[in-house]
Amino acid sequence: MREIVHIQAGQCGNQVGAAFWSTIADEHGLDSAGIYHGTSEAQHERLNVYFNEAAGGKYVPRAVLVDLEPGTMDAVKSGKFGNLFRPDNIIYGQSGAGNIWAKGHYTEGAELADAVLDVVRREAEACDALQGFQLTHSLGGGTGSGMGTLLLSKIREEYPDRMMATFSVAPAPKSSDTVVEPYNATLSMHQLVENSDETFCIDNEALSSIFANTLKIKSPSYDDLNHLVSAVMAGVTTSFRFPGELNSDLRKLAVNMVPFPRLHFFMVGFAPLAAIGSSSFQAVSVPELTQQMFDANNMMVAADPRHGRYLTVAALFRGKVSMKEVDEQIRSVQTKNSAYFVEWIPDNVLKAVCSVPPKDLKMSATFIGNSTSIQEIFRRLGDQFSAMFRRKAFLHWYTGEGMDEMEFTEAESNMNDLVSEYQQYQEAGIDEGDEDYEIEEEKEPLEY
């Protein structure tokens, strides 16, 4: 009932996806062969949202794995949960996209797209009541960004009334893997604005700084980063996977979080932030979780919520947590920091509690914020994009695959529009700037 079909595209998307599947398989009591060993009814009750029961009581992820080169797939298959996936659902090319969005979207990726859509269709048909799709990918490369958004638009065309969520890894502001990242990301954003219903934004730099500042680990591996991302993904999807009342499916989450259809880019956070292996032995409480969850330094994307205002927020607590305490804590955050929440959406912080905590933790909290400050990412991308595009630098790699410069111009202006829309709602509701907001100081204002 209410199934979600998951698609992972490109190297980053597959590695993040693999981490997500191993995390939720653990949470639902599945071993690496997909056999259920759970101990509580809650683990089993909504298992079929993400898993399909196959012969012999084996549970198989409703996942489609896509890449334009074989390397990542070999890595996923040889990983701990590599045998979990259905072999026919793993589809890869040989040529690679060479970090060129146009190859993923128009040439190499387009050749593979029909084979992928056949598998997606088969997965969708195996569902009783498909609620929608989720895609994990990065925006800076060629396959995840180019082919990922191609699949997005094709699925949107075929299933217009189903929800579409993406977990999108944005290019980091200072450290880049490829010089053409701004092109790839801007062209992808152009697609995400139109074809995604909810996009959870993540970037490697924000993750690295969480490791450096909060966890005191100087050079984290990609596995460490993916562990953090999978913790957030597991947190975000908790209310779909376990019994609960609030935000119990993709559509309800979107209804609560997206006041205007284009403004569906969320920043995410997780608490308690514990490094891999060192399961946090310190006692955590709801006030501590709330403080850490709203802390600007713990956002998993390089945008500072203190520079904007929250349109909506969803806070999800897991473990033995009293709803009353959650209500009190969230109310206190809102009263002390009222300037950071738009006043024209009353009750814009949603709270949910799920009794099943993550593995090795007593309790945890996941944060989803629709903040106008997310425009910082798009601004930064836009600046980098126009610096190169003005000189037509590297354009031949794209026009050579049949792209037109017009598409670049359109993508650029769509992103600039998005920035202005966020800015407009950030300022809305204040009487033409004559009110100065002051934050009341109380005993311990949450650090923003």
Swiss-Prot record:
GO annotation terms (biological process): cytoplasmic microtubule organization; intracellular distribution of mitochondria; microtubule cytoskeleton organization; mitotic cell cycle; mitotic spindle elongation; mitotic spindle pole body duplication; nuclear migration by microtubule mediated pushing forces; response to antibiotic
Keywords associated with the record: Antibiotic resistance, Cytoplasm, Cytoskeleton, GTP-binding, Magnesium, Metal-binding, Microtubule, Nucleotide-binding
GO cellular component, one term: astral microtubule
Annotated positions binding GTP: 11, 69, 138, 142-144, 204, 226
Localization: Cytoplasm, Cytoskeleton
The organism's place on the tree of life at top rank: Eukaryota
Pfam families the record matches: Tubulin, Tubulin_C
Positions of Mg(2+) binding: 69
InterPro entries from the UniProt entry: Beta-tubulin_BS (IPR013838), Beta_tubulin (IPR002453), Tub_FtsZ_C (IPR008280), Tubulin (IPR000217), Tubulin/FtsZ-like_C (IPR037103), Tubulin/FtsZ_2-layer-sand-dom (IPR018316), Tubulin/FtsZ_GTPase_sf (IPR036525), Tubulin_C (IPR023123)
Molecular function as annotated in GO: GTP binding; GTPase activity; metal ion binding; structural constituent of cytoskeleton
Annotated region (Disordered), positions in chain: 429-448
Cofactor(s) this protein requires: Mg(2+)
UniProt keyword Cytoplasm, yes or no: yes
Outcome when changing residue 100 to N: Becomes sensitive to rhizoxin
Membership in a protein family: Belongs to the tubulin family.
Oligomer and partners: Dimer of alpha and beta chains. A typical microtubule is a hollow water-filled tube with an outer diameter of 25 nm and an inner diameter of 15 nM. Alpha-beta heterodimers associate head-to-tail to form protofilaments running lengthwise along the microtubule wall with the beta-tubulin subunit facing the microtubule plus end conferring a structural polarity. Microtubules usually have 13 protofilaments but different protofilament numbers can be found in some organisms and specialized cells.
Function text: Tubulin is the major constituent of microtubules, a cylinder consisting of laterally associated linear protofilaments composed of alpha- and beta-tubulin heterodimers. Microtubules grow by the addition of GTP-tubulin dimers to the microtubule end, where a stabilizing cap forms. Below the cap, tubulin dimers are in GDP-bound state, owing to GTPase activity of alpha-tubulin.
Other remarks on this protein: A cold-sensitive nda3 mutation reversibly blocks spindle formation and chromosome movement in mitosis.
The protein's name in its UniProt record: Tubulin beta chain
Native source species: Schizosaccharomyces pombe (strain 972 / ATCC 24843) (Fission yeast)
